[in-house]
Amino acid sequence: MGRSPCCEKAHTNKGAWTKEEDERLVAHIRAHGEGCWRSLPKAAGLLRCGKSCRLRWINYLRPDLKRGNFTEEEDELIVKLHSVLGNKWSLIAGRLPGRTDNEIKNYWNTHIRRKLLSRGIDPVTHRPVTEHHASNITISFETEVAAAARDDKKGAVFRLEEEEERNKATMVVGRDRQSQSQSHSHPAGEWGQGKRPLKCPDLNLDLCISPPCQEEEEMEEAAMRVRPAVKREAGLCFGCSLGLPRTADCKCSSSSFLGLRTAMLDFRSLEMK
């Protein structure tokens, strides 16, 4: 639900006010005061909107309005109020008796704004124009410095990555050259396969005590059976070992059977065994 219209638009006049309408409005306000602007047009016998009557009275018909140009004091006051209040023309008009907000706004845009620019003052910020440009230049310079520092940082990181890749490449080439020099200095026969050196076999140093195995016992028994024949053979001289008759110099311990040497028999028995 919005506000109801102040009057019926179908039965209201629009456009410029006539002299008769101005006289009726002034006479009614002098007699009855401003009152309610919604009911005032009907009471004054005007076919006008209440808003139109209010603006006509405030901006043109009220007796305390000042006519003529603005003075220098009014110009300075408008500039000071604008620096504090901004474009709130109704509040500025309340501090200037006899001046309307619409009149002050038009005067600002046509005269005071140009006057401030000619003095080198920004009409929006009320500061010198050179200072405003200097602050803009400083901000742009700071942004350029920040961008340059950021670019330098990126370049430094990129250079570090390039140096790391270069160092890795040199290390790989150095290892390849070292392996090639080792392969040339050590032949294939010395290193086995030509690439890896010979390794010592893994020795089991765990000691344990266990009875001898059966194969070792059999080997020891065979050695005991062979030892007597070897001893007899070792007790013969060269002539007796060949079966020759015993001489006076012979000192062999072998016995004779029927005047025959038993050396050959011993050898046969040894061979049979």
From Swiss-Prot:
An annotated GO cellular component: nucleus
InterPro entries xref list: Homeodomain-like_sf, Myb_dom, Myb_TF_plants, SANT/Myb
Cellular localization per UniProt: Nucleus
Cited SUPFAM superfamilies: Homeodomain-like
PROSITE patterns listed in its UniProt record: HTH_MYB, MYB_LIKE
Biological process according to GO: negative regulation of DNA-templated transcription; regulation of DNA-templated transcription; regulation of lignin biosynthetic process; response to wounding
Expression induction: By wounding. Triggered by MYB69 to repress lignin biosynthesis.
Taxonomy, superkingdom: Eukaryota
Tissue expression notes: Expressed both in roots and aerial parts.
Gene Ontology MF term list: cis-regulatory region sequence-specific DNA binding; DNA-binding transcription factor activity; sequence-specific DNA binding; transcription cis-regulatory region binding
Region (Disordered): 167-195
UniProt domain HTH myb-type: residue ranges: 9-61, 62-116
Chain residues forming the annotated DNA-binding region: 37-61, 89-112
Record key words, sorted: DNA-binding, Nucleus, Repeat, Repressor, Transcription, Transcription regulation
A Pfam family that the UniProt record links to this protein: Myb_DNA-binding
Primary role: Transcription factor that negatively regulates the expression of caffeic acid O-methyl-transferase genes (COMTs) and of other genes involved in the biosynthesis of lignin, thus preventing lignification.
Record protein name field: MYB31 transcription factor31
Organism taxonomic ancestry: Eukaryota, Viridiplantae, Streptophyta, Embryophyta, Tracheophyta
Gene name in the database record: MYB31
